[in-house]
Amino acid sequence: MTDHSPAPAAQDENRLIAERRAKLSKLREAGVAYPNDFVPDAHAADLHRQYGEQDQEALAAAGVQVKVAGRMMLKRVMGKASFATVQDGSGRIQIYLDRGTLGDEAYAAFKQWDIGDIIAIEGSVFKTNKGELSVHAATARLLSKSLRPLPDKFHGVADQELRYRQRYVDLIMTDATRRTFETRSKAVGSIRQVMLDAGFLEVETPMLHPIPGGAAAKPFVTHHNALDMEMFLRIAPELYLKRLIVGGFERVFEINRNFRNEGVSPRHNPEFTMMEFYAAYADYRWLMDFTEHVLRQAAIAATGSAVLTYQDRELDLSRPFDRLTICEAILKYAPAYTQAQLDDAAFVRAELKKLGADVDGPVLARAGLGALQLALFEETAEAQLWNPTYIIDYPVEVSPLARASDTRPGITERFELFMTGREIANGFSELNDPEDQAERFRAQVEAKDAGDEEAMYFDADYIRALEYGMPPTGGCGIGIDRLVMLLTNSPSIRDVILFPHLRRED
């Protein structure tokens, strides 16, 4: 016979929840259980900053009165007096409560409160004999009853999924998690300000697309009932942003979400944040210089330095980023190869097969030399690109939206930026020849028909926009989540997304 009774830990939690619900019932009977008439006038961090260095006598003489509120994280009842620690959005402050000041009824009520409850305190700022800044409570109120007990310990691999699934608990319990998302906000704020200072206009483009475009990726598909048409969550905003360049906005950018119905890994989440920007009369060389500036300023704003530490290794964004062609990178990081070998498509295909690549699959079966070289780069060199490195001169066949080189047949004016072995940004001089773009779209459709799920669709309206004339333009996309991973020393993309996607909970 199978025993479906709860585990001991679950039984304890259920008992505690039942006890707290009983307390809530008494609060309801007594009046308003969740009052909303208290407004704090001070935060913990501000109190520490303003009064942390003052001594007992100075604070006593000043008679500073404050109103604070937050979650009770610690509670020590010692007869007629008690201490509690309240955590607000800025930090923690100790509260001293005594029966003589509060009165018998209020003090008895406080003793019934639980860790996790949201409480409000009015009182005076003072220092204990041990020198800890505190608030001596003149009044204490319960604002919000916590029905679930907070975990005693909230760290380690065993709790990792719980952190992602119940981020609200993680944020309550883990200072480092809160700092991660504060750092993220600083980085995004810096990027936005740098773009505005450079004369870019921030815009919003559609999230629902009639045709997915702007990247090689598998989209999420949905249906618009009123219009009775299939639609796609956007995989990239690129084609809409370039329509705006056609329309006369010479510098535009967007910070928003993209969606790709692909795998989940420490570097991939189906929903992720990108910053894409486009500048008329700019080429890929200007883009590389400007992207360096954007990332360097984001690092300084978020961490105070352009020299980072990631996974115990230095990552220096203060120096000019390296620039290598695909073949130069292979020869540098896999020096057993020669340029002659890399120029031999049959040799490269054979090497890829040795390395386990699916050379007969829909992507590589039809690949030319450039695409094969790129695949070999991904197998041999990409993971070794620790310091910021631009890989340049991508082949036309894997760059359907990039401008072709005027001097090197088959090569585009495109780059990808790598740090710590990960792609951080992708940019290029934009293809603004409508006839060339139409031909490349047709080649993408053929690839899709041959089984390449990530190949692009033919976007006739985008071709029509180009036919009105788009000025010479450069554009780039920066992966915000991966950048924040570096800025916060986070090993997984889930660590820097507030609510990452997970399998359904059992």
UniProtKB/Swiss-Prot annotation:
Enzyme class: ligase
Pfam families hit by this protein: tRNA-synt_2, tRNA_anti-codon
Entry's localization field: Cytoplasm
GO MF terms held by the record: ATP binding; lysine-tRNA ligase activity; magnesium ion binding; tRNA binding
Catalytic reaction equation(s): tRNA(Lys) + L-lysine + ATP = L-lysyl-tRNA(Lys) + AMP + diphosphate
GO cellular component terms listed in the entry, alphabetical order: cytosol
Domain of life of the organism encoding this protein: Bacteria
Binding-site positions, Mg(2+) 2: E423
Record-linked NCBIfam families: lysS_bact (TIGR00499), PRK00484.1 (NF001756)
Subunit relationships: Homodimer.
Family per record: Belongs to the class-II aminoacyl-tRNA synthetase family.
The protein's name: Lysine--tRNA ligase
Organism: Bordetella petrii (strain ATCC BAA-461 / DSM 12804 / CCUG 43448)
